[in-house]
Amino acid sequence: MSPRRLASSGIDTDDYSAFDRPRRRSRPRTKNRPDYSDLPIGQVTSIDRGRYTCRLDDHDLVAMKARSLGRKAVIVGDRVRLDGDTSGAEGSLARIPQVERRRTVLRRTADDTDPHERAIVANADQIFIVTALAQPEPRVGMIDRVLVAAYDAGVDPVLCLTKADLADPDELMELYGSLDVPVVTTRPGADLDPVRDMLTDRTTVLVGHSGVGKSTLMNALVPGAGRTTGHVNDATGRGRHTSTSAQALELPGGGWIIDTPGVRSFGLSHVTADRILAAFGDLEPITAQCPRGCEHLTSSPECALDRAVEHGLIRPIRLESFRSCLLYTSPSPRDL
């Protein structure tokens, strides 16, 4: 109705609610969602600049993500529906219209202050925390952080100690063996059958610092893998990045192994304080003696964990590692 007609009808033309506003257009909703259930399922084995290498039955193919997936990430280990040209012939390109529900997702953040979590690998059954006994020196804090991420993701952790020819593994084996974390050791030329037994028929992701021997281990387990290996800088004690992206390879005896790029930090800002505490099974029972609302930090008065260290019930290095993980984490639901 025009303003003149509104005025003649006695309606206040200064009242903007009297005017009809055009309705906001929206796309019509439909219940007829695309059905991809008849499409074959492949597994993403590597990613390179928007192209996804997938294993379908007994051959590999290259695919691109369908526009309908939008910003949804597709990561190594994902099980995906495939359509288009799935022959795997040279120059062919398939399409990924749907990502199947993930059983597990291993995540990390760049550091403890980064709010953006990154999904590393999907559908892994276990994680090998690859740690060199020397060159570079083992870092307990890194081991504990990956353990927290593994438990949070519902993935079984295994501590894999490499370069056992350079240093004695007994101290780390005793520390983590007492926490019911399986431990295996490797050295150049040693029999890898114990490692193979743990990998058979499982999907295992290798995580660790650069230079600890992940690619070397993968090359030994998968003939023809061709993963580039590097060396450790004598001045910094750090390894050089040789793997730039995650890659999944099928094991000769069954199962999959996923190599990941070396990391220098493993942030846990996506994990709540309660879940971090649950990952430190040797410390959790002691916190029952803490005052109500205790945050278990260095500044927390009368924290029972400090008394436990004083009485030799827990090692100082365990408490230091726990508090490092805890410092910048998300609050627990009960604290919100």
Please give the residue ranges for each predicted region.
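Canonical P-loop GTPase G-domain recognition
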Residues: 167-210
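Conserved lysine of the Walker
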Residues: 214
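Structural detector for short beta-strands of small beta-barrel domains
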Residues: 38-47
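A conserved segment at the C-terminal end of the G1
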Residues: 218-226
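Short aromatic-glycine-enriched beta-strand elements
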Residues: 50-54
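Conserved C-terminal guanine-recognition region of P-loop GTPase G domains, centered on the G4
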Residues: 123, 130-180, 304, 308-316, ...
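Helix-rich effector regions associated with P-loop NTPase G domains
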Residues: 2-9, 14, 19, 38, ...
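Beta-strand/loop nucleic-acid-binding surfaces
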Residues: 60-73
